[in-house]
Amino acid sequence: MAKGKFERTKPHVNIGTIGHVDHGKTSLTAAITKYFGEYKRYDQIDAAPEEKARGITISTAHVEYETANRHYAHVDCPGHADYVKNMITGAAQMDGAILVVSAADGPMPQTREHILLARQVGVPSIVVFLNKVDQVDDAELLELVELEVRELLSKNEFPGDDIPIVKGSALAALEDSNKTIGEDAIRELMAQVDAYIPTPVRPLDKPFLMPIEDVFSISGRGTVVTGRVERGVVKVGEELEIIGIRPTTKTTCTGVEMFRKLLDQGQAGDNIGALLRGVDREGVERGQVLAKPGTVKPHKKFVAEAYILTKDEGGRHTPFFTNYRPQFYFRTTDVTGIVSLPAGTEMVMPGDNITVDVELIVPIAMEEKLRFAIREGGRTVGAGIVVTIKE
């Protein structure tokens, strides 16, 4: 099946497969590429290259494909630990996920953990593929598994009753052995993904935010802060807030430059220098953010989901306990914080993923779903994401 070049005119959505080991995530990924992309064999996807995100090595396979309506980038991870790390670090951002559940086994421990993680890290929506239906002869049993999956999703605050569940066999699709549960099911799955997973809001359409990386003073012109615009647009003449570390202050952007050229605006993805009115060199520092007034607030206390590196990954060799005080690296700077473990958890071992309470010593511009690294003296020992802000 010859395919032309991907047209970038369609809306772009990032998705991934999640679910228990051996339930068929990689086979399903291969089957989708067979009908909607450049066909990748199972073993081509399974031999996933390693990449680094926030100082953590993760194996992820990336494939792309398109339906009539959208272009998709799809991530599949070979090992369970890779999923945990990927979801917490956001190495491959997911706008939605396809949960793969074997009809023969029903939901298993990693099914539960991936759904919980998806909730914690804010994967907005899930579509279910009930795989290996050819291994179940009893229609009632199939119905039971479907009910169990819906209950599990509802328990984790996903709309379990409304989520599309497509039944099929990834293997049948790959082997062309049964069109109904093979090709037809894969096409039905992608139709549901198209319809049910919303197109994400582009960074450009969100309110302006830029983490400050550096501060310069230019004689006769004032103070310039540099950084990469994370989202939104800033126009010359707009009022902005400087947030984090110190009390929030207001300023006006009197100039934007990029590659030494003056522009009338800077937008998401641009590396810019912003000239600020009425701010002296000492009034602003790396680690603060520049943002549209009233859109983001500084916070110190939050609940986080975190993954702690193993010794082999370059992490700690020993467990830690309540009152552990590492640095939390948010956007461009380290801030010391105190960790409190949940009741009943005595210690955290390298390789664990956990939910913890954190209190920073100074406030940082923070929103739910903001990601961070956990460091000790500049060495990454973990990664996390803000789940809930407390104050």
Curated annotation (Swiss-Prot):
GO MF entries: GTP binding; GTPase activity; guanosine tetraphosphate binding; translation elongation factor activity
This enzyme's EC code(s): 3.6.5.3
Where are the residues of the annotated region G2?
A: 55-59
**Residues annotated as region G5?**
169-171
Q: Which reaction does it catalyse?
A: GTP + H2O = GDP + phosphate + H(+)
> Positions of the region G4?
131-134
Residues annotated to bind Mg(2+): 26
Q: Which GO terms describe its cellular component?
A: cytosol
Which residues are recorded as binding GTP? 19-26, 76-80, 131-134
Please report the stretch or stretches of sequence annotated as the tr-type G domain: 10-201
Compartments reported by the entry: Cytoplasm
Q: What class of enzyme is it?
A: hydrolase
Q: Which family is it part of?
A: Belongs to the TRAFAC class translation factor GTPase superfamily. Classic translation factor GTPase family. EF-Tu/EF-1A subfamily.
Q: What does the subunit section of this Swiss-Prot or TrEMBL entry state?
A: Monomer.
Protein name as it appears in the record: Elongation factor Tu
What's the source species for this entry?
Mesorhizobium japonicum (strain LMG 29417 / CECT 9101 / MAFF 303099)
Q: What's the name of its gene?
A: tufA
